[in-house]
Amino acid sequence: MGGRRPAFLFAIVALVAGVAALVAVVDLNQPGSAKQASPGSRLGVAPRSPASSTTSTSPPVTTTTADPGSLPQTNQLPSASTPAFQAEMAALWAGVVSDSVPAALPAFFPEAAYVQLKAIYSPQTDYTNRSVAEFGLDVGAAHQVLGSNPGSAGLIGVVVPQQYAHWVPPGTCENGVGYFEVANSRLVYEQDGQIHSFGIASMISWRGTWYVVHLGAVERSTEQGVVEDPEAGEGSSAPSSTC
Protein backbone atom coordinates (compact mmCIF):
# COMPACT_ATOMS: atom_id res chain seq x y z
CA MET A 1 0.00 0.00 0.00
CA GLY A 2 2.68 2.43 0.95
CA GLY A 3 4.51 1.99 -2.41
CA ARG A 4 1.44 2.89 -4.60
CA ARG A 5 0.59 6.24 -2.92
CA PRO A 6 2.74 8.46 -5.19
CA ALA A 7 1.19 7.06 -8.34
CA PHE A 8 -2.29 7.51 -6.89
CA LEU A 9 -1.58 11.10 -5.93
CA PHE A 10 -0.17 11.82 -9.39
CA ALA A 11 -3.39 10.55 -10.98
CA ILE A 12 -5.48 12.82 -8.76
CA VAL A 13 -3.34 15.85 -9.62
CA ALA A 14 -3.64 15.11 -13.32
CA LEU A 15 -7.41 14.76 -13.03
CA VAL A 16 -7.72 18.11 -11.22
CA ALA A 17 -5.57 19.83 -13.86
CA GLY A 18 -7.75 18.42 -16.64
CA VAL A 19 -10.94 19.68 -15.01
CA ALA A 20 -9.41 23.14 -14.55
CA ALA A 21 -8.45 23.28 -18.22
CA LEU A 22 -11.98 22.28 -19.26
CA VAL A 23 -13.48 25.02 -17.06
CA ALA A 24 -11.15 27.58 -18.63
CA VAL A 25 -12.22 26.58 -22.15
CA VAL A 26 -15.91 26.83 -21.25
CA ASP A 27 -15.31 30.24 -19.63
CA LEU A 28 -13.78 31.62 -22.80
CA ASN A 29 -17.05 31.03 -24.64
CA GLN A 30 -19.28 32.75 -22.08
CA PRO A 31 -20.81 36.18 -22.97
CA GLY A 32 -18.77 39.02 -21.56
CA SER A 33 -15.51 37.14 -21.59
CA ALA A 34 -12.50 39.43 -22.09
CA LYS A 35 -11.31 37.15 -24.87
CA GLN A 36 -14.61 37.12 -26.81
CA ALA A 37 -14.37 38.59 -30.32
CA SER A 38 -16.91 41.23 -31.27
CA PRO A 39 -19.16 40.57 -34.29
CA GLY A 40 -17.50 43.39 -36.15
CA SER A 41 -14.00 42.09 -35.77
CA ARG A 42 -15.12 38.60 -36.74
CA LEU A 43 -16.24 40.11 -40.09
CA GLY A 44 -12.88 41.71 -40.63
CA VAL A 45 -14.10 45.25 -39.89
CA ALA A 46 -13.59 47.42 -36.87
CA PRO A 47 -16.54 47.43 -34.46
CA ARG A 48 -18.58 50.62 -34.67
CA SER A 49 -18.64 52.93 -31.71
CA PRO A 50 -22.05 54.10 -30.42
CA ALA A 51 -21.55 57.48 -32.09
CA SER A 52 -20.95 55.94 -35.49
CA SER A 53 -24.22 54.03 -35.34
CA THR A 54 -26.24 57.22 -35.92
CA THR A 55 -27.48 57.87 -39.43
CA SER A 56 -25.31 60.42 -41.20
CA THR A 57 -26.85 62.91 -43.62
CA SER A 58 -25.11 64.52 -46.55
CA PRO A 59 -25.15 68.31 -46.85
CA PRO A 60 -28.35 69.49 -48.60
CA VAL A 61 -28.01 69.90 -52.33
CA THR A 62 -28.58 73.53 -53.31
CA THR A 63 -29.47 74.78 -56.74
CA THR A 64 -28.95 78.28 -58.01
CA THR A 65 -30.84 79.99 -60.77
CA ALA A 66 -28.74 82.33 -62.85
CA ASP A 67 -29.99 85.88 -63.31
CA PRO A 68 -31.22 85.88 -66.92
CA GLY A 69 -29.74 89.34 -67.32
CA SER A 70 -26.27 87.95 -66.71
CA LEU A 71 -26.61 85.60 -69.68
CA PRO A 72 -26.17 86.57 -73.34
CA GLN A 73 -29.08 87.70 -75.51
CA THR A 74 -30.78 85.34 -77.98
CA ASN A 75 -32.87 86.01 -81.06
CA GLN A 76 -35.86 84.03 -79.78
CA LEU A 77 -39.24 85.73 -80.22
CA PRO A 78 -41.04 85.67 -76.84
CA SER A 79 -44.43 84.12 -76.25
CA ALA A 80 -47.16 85.71 -74.12
CA SER A 81 -48.51 82.33 -73.02
CA THR A 82 -45.59 81.02 -70.97
CA PRO A 83 -45.83 80.57 -67.18
CA ALA A 84 -42.87 82.93 -66.77
CA PHE A 85 -44.63 85.77 -68.59
CA GLN A 86 -47.87 85.15 -66.73
CA ALA A 87 -45.98 85.31 -63.43
CA GLU A 88 -44.43 88.62 -64.51
CA MET A 89 -47.82 90.11 -65.30
CA ALA A 90 -49.22 88.89 -61.98
CA ALA A 91 -46.34 90.68 -60.26
CA LEU A 92 -46.97 93.84 -62.28
CA TRP A 93 -50.63 93.78 -61.33
CA ALA A 94 -49.83 93.20 -57.65
CA GLY A 95 -47.54 96.23 -57.76
CA VAL A 96 -50.23 98.40 -59.35
CA VAL A 97 -52.90 97.34 -56.84
CA SER A 98 -50.61 97.91 -53.84
CA ASP A 99 -48.73 100.89 -55.35
CA SER A 100 -45.49 98.99 -54.76
CA VAL A 101 -42.57 99.26 -57.17
CA PRO A 102 -40.66 96.36 -55.55
CA ALA A 103 -43.69 94.10 -56.02
CA ALA A 104 -43.90 95.04 -59.71
CA LEU A 105 -40.16 94.83 -60.48
CA PRO A 106 -40.15 91.14 -61.53
CA ALA A 107 -42.02 92.30 -64.66
CA PHE A 108 -39.45 94.97 -65.44
CA PHE A 109 -36.40 94.56 -67.67
CA PRO A 110 -33.51 93.11 -65.61
CA GLU A 111 -30.71 95.47 -64.63
CA ALA A 112 -27.90 93.12 -65.72
CA ALA A 113 -29.51 92.79 -69.15
CA TYR A 114 -29.88 96.57 -69.38
CA VAL A 115 -26.17 96.98 -68.72
CA GLN A 116 -25.42 94.60 -71.59
CA LEU A 117 -27.97 96.26 -73.86
CA LYS A 118 -27.24 99.97 -73.54
CA ALA A 119 -24.27 101.50 -75.35
CA ILE A 120 -24.16 104.57 -73.10
CA TYR A 121 -22.05 105.93 -70.27
CA SER A 122 -22.94 104.36 -66.89
CA PRO A 123 -25.97 102.27 -67.85
CA GLN A 124 -26.38 101.26 -64.20
CA THR A 125 -27.05 104.87 -63.25
CA ASP A 126 -29.44 105.36 -66.15
CA TYR A 127 -31.29 102.20 -65.20
CA THR A 128 -31.86 103.32 -61.62
CA ASN A 129 -32.31 107.06 -62.02
CA ARG A 130 -34.35 107.07 -65.21
CA SER A 131 -35.83 103.72 -66.23
CA VAL A 132 -36.86 102.36 -62.83
CA ALA A 133 -37.77 105.83 -61.56
CA GLU A 134 -40.16 106.40 -64.48
CA PHE A 135 -41.56 102.90 -64.07
CA GLY A 136 -42.31 103.69 -60.44
CA LEU A 137 -44.11 106.91 -61.38
CA ASP A 138 -46.26 105.00 -63.87
CA VAL A 139 -47.07 102.24 -61.37
CA GLY A 140 -48.31 104.93 -58.99
CA ALA A 141 -50.40 106.58 -61.71
CA ALA A 142 -52.01 103.26 -62.66
CA HIS A 143 -52.77 102.66 -59.00
CA GLN A 144 -54.72 105.93 -58.91
CA VAL A 145 -56.84 104.77 -61.87
CA LEU A 146 -58.18 101.94 -59.69
CA GLY A 147 -59.83 104.49 -57.40
CA SER A 148 -60.46 104.34 -53.68
CA ASN A 149 -60.82 100.56 -53.54
CA PRO A 150 -58.01 99.14 -55.69
CA GLY A 151 -58.30 95.75 -54.04
CA SER A 152 -61.68 95.25 -55.71
CA ALA A 153 -60.02 95.11 -59.14
CA GLY A 154 -58.96 91.75 -60.51
CA LEU A 155 -56.62 91.03 -63.37
CA ILE A 156 -58.20 89.20 -66.31
CA GLY A 157 -55.16 89.04 -68.56
CA VAL A 158 -52.71 90.87 -70.79
CA VAL A 159 -53.31 91.12 -74.53
CA VAL A 160 -49.99 91.22 -76.40
CA PRO A 161 -50.23 92.14 -80.11
CA GLN A 162 -47.62 89.64 -81.27
CA GLN A 163 -48.31 90.63 -84.88
CA TYR A 164 -46.66 93.98 -84.17
CA ALA A 165 -43.52 92.52 -82.59
CA HIS A 166 -40.39 93.51 -84.51
CA TRP A 167 -36.64 93.07 -84.25
CA VAL A 168 -34.60 96.12 -83.25
CA PRO A 169 -31.04 95.65 -84.55
CA PRO A 170 -27.89 96.60 -82.62
CA GLY A 171 -26.86 100.23 -82.98
CA THR A 172 -30.43 101.55 -82.78
CA CYS A 173 -31.59 103.86 -79.97
CA GLU A 174 -28.21 103.74 -78.21
CA ASN A 175 -28.39 99.98 -77.85
CA GLY A 176 -25.45 97.70 -78.49
CA VAL A 177 -27.48 94.48 -78.55
CA GLY A 178 -30.51 93.58 -80.67
CA TYR A 179 -33.91 92.61 -79.26
CA PHE A 180 -37.59 92.19 -80.10
CA GLU A 181 -39.98 95.00 -79.16
CA VAL A 182 -43.76 95.11 -78.94
CA ALA A 183 -45.73 98.25 -78.14
CA ASN A 184 -49.19 98.94 -76.75
CA SER A 185 -50.12 95.67 -75.08
CA ARG A 186 -53.32 95.88 -73.02
CA LEU A 187 -53.64 95.00 -69.34
CA VAL A 188 -57.29 93.98 -68.90
CA TYR A 189 -59.02 93.88 -65.51
CA GLU A 190 -62.48 93.72 -63.95
CA GLN A 191 -63.74 96.06 -61.26
CA ASP A 192 -67.28 96.38 -59.91
CA GLY A 193 -68.58 94.12 -62.62
CA GLN A 194 -67.09 96.20 -65.43
CA ILE A 195 -64.19 95.46 -67.78
CA HIS A 196 -61.42 98.07 -67.99
CA SER A 197 -57.94 98.21 -69.47
CA PHE A 198 -54.85 100.33 -69.92
CA GLY A 199 -51.76 99.99 -72.06
CA ILE A 200 -48.19 98.85 -71.56
CA ALA A 201 -46.23 101.31 -73.68
CA SER A 202 -43.34 99.00 -74.58
CA MET A 203 -41.99 95.56 -73.82
CA ILE A 204 -38.71 94.23 -75.12
CA SER A 205 -37.20 90.77 -75.16
CA TRP A 206 -34.33 89.18 -73.33
CA ARG A 207 -33.54 85.54 -73.99
CA GLY A 208 -37.02 84.78 -75.29
CA THR A 209 -39.01 86.53 -72.55
CA TRP A 210 -40.98 89.78 -72.67
CA TYR A 211 -40.20 92.42 -70.05
CA VAL A 212 -41.79 95.81 -69.47
CA VAL A 213 -39.34 98.60 -70.27
CA HIS A 214 -41.83 101.50 -70.47
CA LEU A 215 -45.17 101.18 -68.70
CA GLY A 216 -47.00 104.49 -69.25
CA ALA A 217 -44.96 106.23 -71.94
CA VAL A 218 -41.80 105.77 -73.98
CA GLU A 219 -41.12 109.51 -73.87
CA ARG A 220 -42.53 112.07 -71.46
CA SER A 221 -42.39 115.82 -71.15
CA THR A 222 -42.80 115.97 -67.36
CA GLU A 223 -41.57 113.99 -64.39
CA GLN A 224 -45.03 112.61 -63.67
CA GLY A 225 -46.58 109.20 -63.91
CA VAL A 226 -48.46 108.33 -67.08
CA VAL A 227 -51.23 105.79 -67.74
CA GLU A 228 -51.35 104.75 -71.36
CA ASP A 229 -54.82 104.93 -72.91
CA PRO A 230 -57.10 103.84 -70.04
CA GLU A 231 -60.40 102.62 -71.49
CA ALA A 232 -63.64 100.87 -70.64
CA GLY A 233 -63.48 97.40 -72.15
CA GLU A 234 -60.41 95.66 -73.52
CA GLY A 235 -59.38 98.54 -75.77
CA SER A 236 -57.20 98.02 -78.81
CA SER A 237 -53.50 97.98 -79.62
CA ALA A 238 -52.05 100.28 -82.25
CA PRO A 239 -48.94 99.30 -84.23
CA SER A 240 -45.74 101.14 -83.42
CA SER A 241 -42.14 100.99 -84.58
CA THR A 242 -40.71 102.36 -81.36
CA CYS A 243 -37.47 100.96 -80.02
Short names for language-model regions:
Residues A20-R42:
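C-terminal region of N-terminal signal peptides and the immediate post-cleavage residues
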Residues I12-L22:
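Core hydrophobic alpha-helical transmembrane segments of single-pass membrane proteins
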Residues S122-H196, C243:
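Surface-exposed, charged secondary-structure patches
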Residues G2, G18-A20, E234-G235:
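Extracellular/periplasmic juxtamembrane helices and adjacent flexible linkers that interface
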Residues W93-V101, P106-Y114, G140, Q144-G147, ...:
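Sec-exported extracytoplasmic/periplasmic mature domains
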Residues G2-A14:
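N-terminal Sec-pathway targeting helices
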